[in-house]
Amino acid sequence: MSERTTLCTFRLDGHWIGIEVSSVQEVLRHHPVTSLRWAQEAVQGLLNLRGQIVTAVDLRCVLGMPPRPEQLTPTQVVVRVGAAAVSLWVDEVGDVVELDAGACERVPGTLSRMN
């Protein structure tokens, strides 16, 4: 019997991507973000999530994709990274799916620092 993994899926510029559901803290819509004037382009700002300060990152920018159309409001997937949390801006959230671990592609080496 092959090993199974459960993923929270989301769409970015027409591509479906998944992250292990155990890493997902919650999904937010229309949560206010405070901009940071001198932050890197991908950093959209900070949000206060029940007293926890969370960095908001636009995955389109990180992955070199075109900017999100203005009429498309991003959905925020808050993921746990060690003791911290990061809000990943995505186009839309899909389903939670269970797949054979072998059916999933590994994270590209260019993104390994985000692992």
Per-region residue spans from a language model:
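An acidic, low-aromatic, low-complexity terminal/linker signal
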Residues: 1-115
